[in-house]
Amino acid sequence: MLDQLRQTGFDILTRNHAEAILAHDFPGDLNLLCKVIAEFRISLEEVIRGGGGEAGLTQRLRHELSDLNWRKHNFSVETVVDGRARAGISHEVDHVKFAEAGALALEIEWNNKDPFFDRDLENFQRLHALSAISVGIIVTRGASMQDAFLDRITDWMRGQGLSSEDELDRLGIGTRTAAQRKAVADQVARGMPFADAFARKFVADKFGQATTHWSKLEDRVQRGVGNPCPLLLIGLPERVLI
């Protein structure tokens, strides 16, 4: 199941026997999860219209997971001393699948600041230590998608014949700041085509290195963040963009 994702370009990384746990204890859930993720697509027009944010992009994926009973859940933990609650803390996870063998926790990090990975991994670590979850799963932008954004968005702009701010406004892509517009105008004044100037500024602002994407997640896991929780990490490849 995971091998099929690997063969079609998805970044897949597992830690602490997660792959064996999923295959043995959650084969049906893993199969359905892989199927939903393999079929997921993101429109470049949606990416640009939405200013790079989540909006409707990953909401479709969230709805599909919810339909499969991967629901938002708030884990509540209390410390009890001599029968009296002394302290309490909660851990909210966007998608949790409860099964007979245990629970799977999943977070989608499309385009947050990269410290959100620390939050997710540390949450998984604590929940696993409490035997509340069996595996933690994170889905984010893969390496090939991250590398392809500039070329793909530039090509889309050219294909749409977009060559001015007025044409962007016509498509409803006019909610950018004055500073962003000026940066594009300055590049155009230096001779850069409008589509190229817009794409460079857009990608730098929205999908920069300080946002959630594969290399940032991989780096944290290689350093041991989240250990010893079993982890499955999935990076969406360029082919998801249409």
Predicted region positions:
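Active-site metal-binding core of divalent-cation-utilizing nuclease and nuclease-like domains
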Residues: V47-G51, R60-A101, P115-E122
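Glycine-rich active-site/cofactor-binding loop and its immediate structural neighborhood
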Residues: H95, A105-I108
